[in-house]
Amino acid sequence: MKKLENYEQILNKIKEEEYFLLYVSMNNCSVCLVDMPKVEKIVSEQNFPAYYIKASEIPEAVGQLSLFSVPVVILFYEGREIHRQAKIIDFDELNYRIEQISENK
């Protein structure tokens, strides 16, 4: 997963990419550290574009994307958020949603 450094980069991905996953974490989040490799494995197996941000580094994204807890996984498709999971990530559900998007491309 590639790191996005600011809110403008997030907006550009939403506008430019047909679909992608955004993973949101924070530095002091132990669950985030455990979940990130699992998410990376799913997106790499599906060849699905994915990016991550540290919520504490992009406060504008926290407000604009309603990021009230971490970790958060958001799937964007055709410029819209179509799926979100926060705190407890259901990896089977995430994999299923990514497969659905991949089949529709």
Tell me what each language-model feature is.
Residues 12-13, 63-65:
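Short amphipathic alpha-helix with an adjacent loop that forms part of the alpha/beta core around
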Residues 77-105:
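Non-catalytic, surface beta->alpha helical segment in thiol-disulfide oxidoreductase systems
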Residues 8-11, 59-60, 92:
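Acidic phosphotransfer microenvironment of two-component signaling modules
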Residues 9-41:
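Local sequence-structure signature of Cys/Sec-based thiol-disulfide redox active-site neighborhoods
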Residues 4, 24, 43, 47-61:
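Thiol-based oxidoreductase modules, predominantly thioredoxin-like and allied folds used
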Residues 65-74:
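Structural micro-motif
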Residues 1-19, 97, 103-105:
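N-terminal leader/targeting and pre-domain segments
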